[in-house]
Amino acid sequence: MKYKIFASTTPQTEPVLNKLRAVLKTWQAVENGYEYVFVLGGDGFFVSTLANYNCDSCKVVGINTGHIGFYTSFNGDDLDENFISKLTSFEFKKINLLEVKTKNHSFLVLNELAVYTNTAYPINIFIDDNHWESYRGSGLLIGPRTGSTALAKSAKGAVIFPNVDVVQIIELNPLLHPNQITIQSPIILPMQTKVEFRIKKAFKAEQFPNFYADGIKLDLKNEDTSISFQLVLSRSMFHASLKTKDFIDKLKSTFIKQS
């Protein structure tokens, strides 16, 4: 088998990386034409590595060396003499990513696209070409199911379980007064839904909102802007447990503390 490794540079990753290389000693490390991609790190590294790294039909394996591991199926303790046989017996599936399109660019999002504005700049939201609302506030989040345990959760969005492929929109600190009232609650939309944000050119460039795709700032000019969103199937295949119990266990170990 041919493989490629992406590893974070944290101290705790290095021994796991060495262990993985030893386990894969009968496989061939290559730069192109690989069948497996191994990503070593936490969820943040996984997202930054693979959100726009979408190789055709390669199998992506996450190995957690960080604190949170919603995108990873293994940790260093799993890298034993049985690892390869377990790995080749697992089912890998394509997942839904959020495709983001602007006038000149198209890219994929695993967690969320975040819009921030410090001037409560108006953003018109359209759902399947129907005007939903004119939002004013601190910003907006939009993302697929996979992002519901990331920034969306911190913003009081819904935690969405596996096998529920939807798009979620969350308002951040909406501006409210008698003539400006928005939905305020998170919106959950079916996977086929097309969403569009329309923003007019600002009088001053510094008033124009800032846009971040999985934490990376986008270079969007101060001009009339339309950004569209829709779920698309990844080209890569991923292994992550879709069992309810496994997801509940991760949620409880990460977020829920009770005596």
Curated annotation (Swiss-Prot):
The keyword ATP-binding applies. One of its GO terms (molecular function) is ATP binding. Involved in the regulation of the intracellular balance of NAD and NADP, and is a key enzyme in the biosynthesis of NADP. Catalyzes specifically the phosphorylation on 2'-hydroxyl of the adenosine moiety of NAD to yield NADP. Its main location: cytoplasm. It is found in: Cytoplasm. GO terms for biological process: NAD metabolic process; NADP biosynthetic process. Keywords: ATP-binding, Cytoplasm, Kinase, NAD, NADP, Nucleotide-binding, Transferase. This is NAD kinase. Belongs to the NAD kinase family. It catalyses: NAD(+) + ATP = ADP + NADP(+) + H(+). The keyword Kinase applies. Its cofactor is a divalent metal cation. HAMAP family: NAD_kinase (MF_00361). Its EC number is 2.7.1.23. Pfam families: NAD_kinase, NAD_kinase_C.
